[in-house]
Amino acid sequence: MKASLLKKLDVLSDRYEELTALLGDAEVISDQTRFRAYSREYAEVEPVILAFRDYRKVQADLEGAQALLKDSDPELRDLAEEEVAEARGRLAALGDSLQRMLLPKDPNDSRNVFLEIRAGTGGDEAAIFSGDLFRMYSRYAERQGWRVETLSENEGEHGGYKEVIARVEGDNVYAKLKFESGAHRVQRVPETESQGRIHTSACTVAVLPEPDEQAAIEINPADLRVDTYRSSGAGGQHVNKTDSAVRITHIPSGIVVECQEERSQHKNRAKAMAWLAAKLNDQQQAAAQQAIASTRKLLVGSGDRSERIRTYNFPQGRVTDHRINLTLYSLGEVMEGAVEQVIEPLLQEYQADQLAALGD
């Protein structure tokens, strides 16, 4: 392990001792705000320190076993060789675990997301593929135990969607889906193609973390134009009776959001406002990330939605993620929701990139 990382762990050990003392201090205990803050920090630091103590113990065991390698007794040397090999293996595993614990935490990882899928070049075929992608992500969400709620949809003339917006709720949704933003390209023979020619179409996907508290994003009511209209979505006969659908325009940014899936105008407005907050937050984050990217560009995770990130080739049964040069010949499984086949290698590559930078 790098000396710089060991130094960080030593500093963290000192902080752990300090937190232990603070949490036993009567003055801190009487101040619930400080007590909760220190308790949260303690809970985050403790697993790292316990692992670091194990690391130091195994390190001492290794040094002791190595000293015995010089012993005159051959049986003792053989035993020491076994202990050295075992200790080195445990030390390497603990070192890897500690490095991952020290990786910078993305504060958005635990959040729900707004998933936006839009048809790009390719006309009807692009809209159909948008529908396929939405189905793929919905199946993946089912596997993860997440809940998918459609907020807005604009259906294509021959199936699929020109645009579909959904909220995905569950554990660590953003952590899994954050690298799906970008341009997704499909190569296949459309059902309407009589000559059997392969067509290329594209869709864009955007994954926006839902802010924890809408209040964190300052939205001036004077900056909003709110329009209501009769829903053309779900709701049966009710949709013909009231203007329950809501469209909100944020005038300074030009961002427009709408929700028509609920029968209640109040619920549609609340969901549209949450989505607007996410889009404004995303706009702020994008500006900050651009500044970081100019200094150091990560292999995975630039989040540029104009970037072509993946190709789905149906004739070959192939899916290729261009960011990490990953090619799989299990397109059918992926389209049925096994997106983890692509997501997990992306996450591993991102972690490897972070690990390489750790301690710099």
Swiss-Prot record:
- Where is this chain primarily localised? cytoplasm
The yes or no answer to whether the keyword Protein biosynthesis is present is yes
State where the protein is found: Cytoplasm
One annotated GO molecular function: translation release factor activity, codon specific
Q: Which PROSITE patterns match?
A: RF_PROK_I
Give the N5-methylglutamine positions (modified residues): Q237
Q: Which InterPro entries match?
A: PCRF (IPR005139), Pep_chain_release_fac_I (IPR000352), Pep_chain_release_fac_I_sf (IPR045853), Prokaryotic/Mito_RF (IPR050057), RF-1 (IPR004373)
Annotated family: Belongs to the prokaryotic/mitochondrial release factor family.
- Would you tell me the protein name for this molecule? Peptide chain release factor 1
Q: Which organism is it from?
A: Pseudomonas aeruginosa (strain LESB58)
